């Protein structure tokens, strides 16, 4: 972003949002398969509607997985355990319609053990990674705080402090930037599903005092900050009953909240041979290490691939004028220190593990849990020394 004064907005959604229900089921299927068969090829898509879950896509695996039970367990964990919520893990219908991966794709992706590192990309495409110094996790402030809000909503729902909360929720945060830096929160929107008996006045007070204000450090919320809580006035019907949920519908929530471009490929349900996912994780890893090394305040990385070809077509670094050395020099360091071939990424980030269900809600980036290996800054020292 240019160094000037402006407003910028990002949104997030809770784990109970219908599209996120679908994402979590898809990644839970992937994890269940990877627990038995880490070399599986998985493209698991999910649709969820009132009382119905449809599982479809392409899976090639030796694993024996009860897909219906995985879907039910995921819905239960999210909190849809009552027919009043529109979907109930015990009684919903689950339809399974998986095919195997196309052999035309497999011949370009699979390699012999002797040619292991030259596994081709599972598809063509372009991916972006981004990092900046606006938050401790080197994420843009609007999306980082938007995630904190819906995480807080989930926490207060699950621990019973606000028992009238239901699983579906959305947040939106608008920051005022001064000289290109986040200075204060201009507007917070938080819509949360709730039980029918609670008054709107009680919802507004609890959301502002118990969810919004504790989610921000002192100084960001000012007397001028606007709070919009359940602006429609009522949010009883939600989740898959309110809207049909589909895997891959929240790609901006999953990434950087619109602060940088997006290549268009979704993440959830895909094994790491799909560069839509693995290369986007690697691009974040690169960008975060560049910023952690002090080589730039902001870093955007683009990589692109051709199906069946291992080497990326391009690796492009853009620091928006914040770099301490030229962008071309940073890109050269990236090529020296990061193996961005698909199998190189899998090895570098240890991606053949059942780690993906956690990624499917509250963002794939800016997370501190140990599963998120692409959030490590272990290459920063080498980049700094090389510069």
Swiss-Prot record:
Record-level GO BP terms: one-carbon metabolic process; S-adenosylmethionine biosynthetic process
Cofactor(s) recorded in Swiss-Prot or TrEMBL: Mg(2+); K(+)
Region span, Flexible loop: 101-111
Pathway: Amino-acid biosynthesis; S-adenosyl-L-methionine biosynthesis; S-adenosyl-L-methionine from L-methionine: step 1/1
Binding residues annotated for Mg(2+), in chain numbering: 19
PANTHER family from the UniProt entry: S-ADENOSYLMETHIONINE SYNTHETASE
Protein name: S-adenosylmethionine synthase
Lineage: Bacteria, Pseudomonadati, Pseudomonadota, Betaproteobacteria, Burkholderiales
Gene, per the UniProt record: metK
